[in-house]
UniProtKB/Swiss-Prot annotation:
Signal peptide residues on this chain, from the entry's feature table: 1-23
One GO MF term: toxin activity
Protein name: Heat-labile enterotoxin IIB, B chain
Disulfide bonds: C33-C104
SUPFAM superfamilies: Bacterial enterotoxins
Biological role stated in the UniProt entry: The biological activity of the toxin is produced by the A chain, which activates intracellular adenyl cyclase.
Keywords per UniProt: Disulfide bond, Enterotoxin, Signal, Toxin, Virulence
Length: 122
């Protein structure tokens, strides 16, 4: 069994156990995103995960199957750095497993900054 298949099986099992994983964004996720100035983006298939430390483009980026690009912000202070680390793990799991994600992303910058991310059950 390939590494990608093992990761996909693990992510699917975790999604089945999770009460927050649904087809489409969960109501909890939608409600939280709607309380912000960010936009809800549902059912995104992430295909690339990029880590960049260049001065002008510093950060983590994800790319969708349709070419959309989003940035996962860095955080310097605890507990924010723990939360962004979890968002990066979810994004990486989605890329490796092929599972879709729902994102709450701020359109205030380009590329849009992900404020929240949720795995979508298949």
């Amino acid at each position: 069994m390939s590494f990608k298949k093992i990761i996909k099986a693990f992510v699917i099992m975790a999604a089945l156990v999770s009460v927050q994983a649904h087809a489409g964004a969960s109501q909890f996720f939608k409600d939280n995103c709607n309380r912000t100035t960010a936009s809800l983006v549902e059912g995104v298939e992430l295909t690339k995960y990029i880590s960049d430390i260049n001065n002008n483009t510093d950060g983590m980026y994800v790319v969708s199957s349709t070419g959309g690009v989003w940035r996962i912000s860095r955080a310097k202070d605890y507990p924010d750095n723990v939360m962004t680390a979890e968002m990066r793990k979810i994004a990486m799991a989605a890329v490796l497993s092929g599972m879709r994600v729902n994102m709450c992303a701020s359109p205030a910058s380009s590329p849009n900054v992900i404020w929240a991310i949720e795995l979508e059950a298949e």
